[in-house]
Amino acid sequence: MLIFFNKYLHINLNILSYIPYRAIFSLLTSFFINLYIGPYFIYYFKKLQTYQIIRNNGPKTHYSKKNTPTMGGIFIIFSILFSTILYCNLSNIYIWYVISILIGYGLIGFIDDYKKIKYKNSQGLKLKWKYFFLSIIAFIFICMIKINNKDIISTELIIPFCIKNDFEINYLYIFLSYFVLVGTSNAVNLTDGLDGLAIMPVIFLTCGLTLISLFSDNINISHYLHVHYVKNSTELAILCMAIVGSGLGFLWFNSYPAKVFMGDVGSLALGGSLGAIAILLHQELLLIIMGGIFVFETISVILQIISFKIRKKRIFQMAPVHHHYEVKGILEPLIIVRFWIVSLILLLISLISLKVC
């Protein structure tokens, strides 16, 4: 929006023409918005009694969280949208693709949270309907980017740590994109089980995608680093920084002991947005490395289900795996910080892969 005013109202603020400055302003704006509005949201969440529903079969330590409000993802989404609309060039179609996922998946998460709170049940929206709506939005997103934008019509798959790292997969790319969108949103959702556990890996991952969006818009740098050239992808860096700032602002209230949880409205929206950005940048496989914590959590749930159905035995004492460590007696803050450390290391490994060959 500021770009529009600067151009058509002849304000001549040259600083707005520089991506790094707009990205920094975007981060700071979303951060301070959350710091300001967070206490008000938390107050009204408590007044409306939007408390986290605790599973009866969950860790006993979680009963102390039953009076902690959820649905904090609402003010995460608000601050991201505010900064994005304020600082991004809104003629850039990539921005609207990600915003559509942010809002669409956030709405599904909101309905899920609302049903949990209303009916005092941890199930919320039925699983089949949840995946149905997530899938519908995912396929609409994929169709839109393939029909409307020739710059990302390529169906090449970029494989990290390979000398010849681009492989043509044709129509399989549609299914890969679908699994990235739906999978990432649910992976973040599964990870969001401890205070601050999910939001910090989201921040790290988003920082990595920010760098790649900057590299991808320069044909020489993208060729040198073996990343896909995506024209005008630098605007995504501003949106990414809005996510980082919003995440840091939310962590202010979500760090142990949490005053608010993001709920499904936040985790589905953030996970879906990260998946969408990775698809636009052709970094679907690198996303798996960057978001290794989310992958680990998801695999732990899948293995637990398979093992119990086939062997009638559990691999983990409880899934997702962060609950396993809780049951083993490891303190919650230790689990959280160690997962953050692993997430940071995975980010560094993923960045090394850009020029390893």
UniProtKB/Swiss-Prot annotation:
Main localization category: membrane
Pathway recorded for this protein: Cell wall biogenesis; peptidoglycan biosynthesis
Transmembrane domains' residue ranges: 23-43, 70-90, 91-111, 127-147, 171-191, 196-216, 236-256, 260-280, 286-306, 334-354
Keywords (A to Z) from UniProt: Cell cycle, Cell division, Cell inner membrane, Cell membrane, Cell shape, Cell wall biogenesis/degradation, Magnesium, Membrane, Metal-binding, Peptidoglycan synthesis, Transferase, Transmembrane, Transmembrane helix
InterPro entries: Glycosyl_transferase_4 (IPR000715), PNAcMuramoyl-5peptid_Trfase (IPR003524), PNAcMuramoyl-5peptid_Trfase_CS (IPR018480)
EC number of the protein: 2.7.8.13
Membrane topology annotation: Multi-pass membrane protein
GO BP annotations, alphabetical order: cell division; cell wall organization; peptidoglycan biosynthetic process; regulation of cell shape
Function: Catalyzes the initial step of the lipid cycle reactions in the biosynthesis of the cell wall peptidoglycan: transfers peptidoglycan precursor phospho-MurNAc-pentapeptide from UDP-MurNAc-pentapeptide onto the lipid carrier undecaprenyl phosphate, yielding undecaprenyl-pyrophosphoryl-MurNAc-pentapeptide, known as lipid I.
Protein name, per record: Phospho-N-acetylmuramoyl-pentapeptide-transferase
Native source species: Buchnera aphidicola subsp. Acyrthosiphon pisum (strain 5A)
